[in-house]
């Protein structure tokens, strides 16, 4: 059996992106990282406590799997974004550092392990995301719901944000399941402008992702909706504003915009570093358009300070 088809084998970097429709073409000379792109190094006992809890419960975080630059700061403050359903994704998005392959079966004990970890970490706000699971009948929606229910049972005061995949080909079923067990915040990222989807999000569809957000809001008007994009993949400022307008037209409440950073040479190159002034301009436009909260800046990620992002919207 070819290793590529074996269950549980994780491919990263060039091994992951080799088969995408539009190949990754590295720049002859990488753009120099500007001085405003700086991450804080992991420090403090709390960082290592979080790591130990995660390992003991056999849990994954997107902070680790996607090589997030903010991991030191978030772990040190006792926050983490849990990544359920394993650490192997069925998609090959060339901006993302999560591994690709044929995933293992779901762990039926994961919801309980997650709930125990949330309680042990004394989290007031938790973000749950996942790999894409195109191999599952419901795309993993029921597993999300099981995790929400388990956390509600053991930590009823904890606010829950879910960052979901697109549930391609099974959207209605997924919406039914997640409407029966709603989170406090429903997040699904558009990631980039529609012109760049074939290159950056092979297998995804811009209109479908917008429809997911709109349909969930229609079914659950009291649940806050959220989405985010990266800049630096080749989009123009005008395209960024067009995406923002599309999100507002689909009743999305909260927004994140951050700088794309290349995880490895096998990933899409950074084509521009957006300046702090331009991020401020995007933020102003977002509020002018009616977003209830906009987190905009070079180091912003979808779940970075998610508790602070949501506080003024859901309380």
UniProtKB/Swiss-Prot annotation:
Annotated [4Fe-4S] cluster 2 binding lies at 89, 93, 96
Q: What is its EC number?
A: 2.8.1.8
What are the UniProt keywords, alphabetically?
4Fe-4S, Cytoplasm, Iron, Iron-sulfur, Metal-binding, S-adenosyl-L-methionine, Transferase
Any GO CC annotation of this UniProt entry: cytoplasm
Q: Is Acyltransferase one of the keywords UniProt gives this record?
A: no
Please name the GO terms that the record assigns under molecular function.
4 iron, 4 sulfur cluster binding; lipoate synthase activity; metal ion binding
Residue positions annotated to bind [4Fe-4S] cluster 1 are: 63, 68, 74, 303
Q: Which reaction does it catalyse?
A: [[Fe-S] cluster scaffold protein carrying a second [4Fe-4S](2+) cluster] + N(6)-octanoyl-L-lysyl-[protein] + 2 oxidized [2Fe-2S]-[ferredoxin] + 2 S-adenosyl-L-methionine + 4 H(+) = [[Fe-S] cluster scaffold protein] + N(6)-[(R)-dihydrolipoyl]-L-lysyl-[protein] + 4 Fe(3+) + 2 hydrogen sulfide + 2 5'-deoxyadenosine + 2 L-methionine + 2 reduced [2Fe-2S]-[ferredoxin]
Ranges for domain Radical SAM core: 75-292
Note the PROSITE patterns from the entry: RADICAL_SAM
Where is this gene product found? Cytoplasm
For activity, the cofactor(s) needed are:
[4Fe-4S] cluster
Cofactor binding summary note: Binds 2 [4Fe-4S] clusters per subunit. One cluster is coordinated with 3 cysteines and an exchangeable S-adenosyl-L-methionine.
The record's section on Pfam families has: LIAS_N, Radical_SAM
Family designation:
Belongs to the radical SAM superfamily. Lipoyl synthase family.
This protein is called: Lipoyl synthase
């Amino acid at each position: 059996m070819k290793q590529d088809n074996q269950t549980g084998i994780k491919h990263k970097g060039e091994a992951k992106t080799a088969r995408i429709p539009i190949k990754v073409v590295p720049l002859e000379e990488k753009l120099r990282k500007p001085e405003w792109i700086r991450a804080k190094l992991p420090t403090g006992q709390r960082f290592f406590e979080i790591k130990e809890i995660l390992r003991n419960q056999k849990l994954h975080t997107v902070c680790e799997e996607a090589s997030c630059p903010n991991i030191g700061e978030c772990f040190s403050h006792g926050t983490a974004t849990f990544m359920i359903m394993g650490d192997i994704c069925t998609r090959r998005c060339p901006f993302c550092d999560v591994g690709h392959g044929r995933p293992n079966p779901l762990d039926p004990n994961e919801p309980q392990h997650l709930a125990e970890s949330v309680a042990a970490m004394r989290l007031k706000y938790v973000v749950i995301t996942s790999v894409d699971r195109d191999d599952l009948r419901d795309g993993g929606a029921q597993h999300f719901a099981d995790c929400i229910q388990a956390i509600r049972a053991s930590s009823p005061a904890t606010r829950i944000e879910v960052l979901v995949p697109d549930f391609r080909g099974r959207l209605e079923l997924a919406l039914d399941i997640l409407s029966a067990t709603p989170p406090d915040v429903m997040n699904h990222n558009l990631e980039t402008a529609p012109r760049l989807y074939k290159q950056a999000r092979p297998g995804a569809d811009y209109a479908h992702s917008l429809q997911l957000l709109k349909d969930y809001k229609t079914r659950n008007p009291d649940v806050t909706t959220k989405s985010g994009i990266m800049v630096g993949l080749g989009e123009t400022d005008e395209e960024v504003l067009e995406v923002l307008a599309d999100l507002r037209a689909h009743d999305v409440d909260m927004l994140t915009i951050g700088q794309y950073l290349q995880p490895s040479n096998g990933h899409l190159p950074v084509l521009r570093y957006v300046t702090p002034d331009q991020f401020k301009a995007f933020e102003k436009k977002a509020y002018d358009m009616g977003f209830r909260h906009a987190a905009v800046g070079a180091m912003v990620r979808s779940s970075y300070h998610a508790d602070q992002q949501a506080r003024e919207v859901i309380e």
